[in-house]
Amino acid sequence: MEEHYYVSIDIGSSSVKTIVGEKFHNGINVIGTGQTYTSGIKNGLIDDFDIARQAIKDTIKKASIASGVDIKEVFLKLPIIGTEVYDESNEIDFYEDTEINGSHIEKVLEGIREKNDVQETEVINVFPIRFIVDKENEVSDPKELIARHSLKVEAGVIAIQKSILINMIKCVEACGVDVLDVYSDAYNYGSILTATEKELGACVIDIGEDVTQVAFYERGELVDADSIEMAGRDITDDIAQGLNTSYETAEKVKHQYGHAFYDSASDQDIFTVEQVDSDETVQYTQKDLSDFIEARVEEIFFEVFDVLQDLGLTKVNGGFIVTGGSANLLGVKELLSDMVSEKVRIHTPSQMGIRKPEFSSAISTISSSIAFDELLDYVTINYHDSEETEEDVIDVKDKDNESKLGGFDWFKRKTNKKDTHENEVESTDEEIYQSEDNHQEHKQNHEHVQDKDKDKEESKFKKLMKSLFE
């Protein structure tokens, strides 16, 4: 049986990440990754086309070497910036008894895309909430059911500004690969939540380099999403100003000594930094450093609370899930736990080689790709035999972990701080993960699911450009 590999690209403000993965039982097996740091992206968008393109190209090459896969087609993750989330429905009719298949599902979903009448936006994701067969039978997956009259879908829709979409896809396809489809972070975050969290109402907070993204899920579905232009870079700027040192030095000490919860920071960890206006070096403690970090991270969380209040939310019973590169900072969980009465957890992907919060978007893009391929019946998944341990595989389906319930006292400002120390996952500089599988074996066995069709489907970019000029 053919092996089907999924390649995702995450274009972030500080780095570009690529993951090559495959479906493995109910999870994803990571074959290889690549990561390249870049200055060509600002606030999650293309700032310098040439620099960004080179970073994407380098990252694809690293992932290709690590996995032994010749990468030709990719799935692209898009940021929440410039997006709108809303609900829509569509219905198709049948004039005889019909067994529903993936083509019918694709048709009814495509009808929702065609209903978008805002010229400056493009619908990028339509995620089914429920299907209704013959106006009465509500189901989550109608494949193989017999419909006598109709198939209706009630779905959530994510649309993005066309200029953002075009430039992101153009930059990726300039690297010699085709973008098969795109997935918004707003939708992707659903794969990092447990079923209980999604049902009760959970808030995902992705703190990146330039942007903090927020998505709220409730009753199993995405409710809304937004972004805040305040994130890790602002933390570093505050450190540089507070310690009177360079940005580069501030970034270094943030990663080595940073702590986001003042009461748990140490006054015994001492470091020295050079001053920007003299040749002198000055000593500081981790507690001194934490004073600047805590203030900014706290401000980011208050901005998140404002977003939730704008949505009319007074409870987040499923808790807060923090991820993204800045979630690596020690004390982030402790600080947020001190500000809210609901549970807080840091999300880190479970697979070997990507066990860092900054890989959450890239791996969840693969989860989204697999979910839609299975819904539309595009692929028959090969469940590989493997010696990999369970901890190396992240669930594609929602996990039914028990979440902490309890009253939600809205968002508390800081009161009595705890003295407990929360060890977060530390970031490393690893750029390439190479699996134990032999590279040559992957090259010989690899054949992408779309490559078997001689009449290859046009890329997302080519389709979009055609539509603009029709």
UniProtKB/Swiss-Prot annotation:
Membrane topology: Peripheral membrane protein
Keyword Cell division: yes
GO cellular component: cell division site; cytoplasmic side of plasma membrane
Protein name per UniProt: Cell division protein FtsA
Keyword set, alphabetical order: Cell cycle, Cell division, Cell membrane, Membrane
Compositional bias ranges of the Basic and acidic residues kind: 436-461
Protein's GO biological process: FtsZ-dependent cytokinesis
Protein purpose: Cell division protein that is involved in the assembly of the Z ring. May serve as a membrane anchor for the Z ring.
Family assignment from sequence similarity: Belongs to the FtsA/MreB family.
Pfam name, any one: FtsA
Residue span of region Disordered: 416-470
Location in the cell: Cell membrane
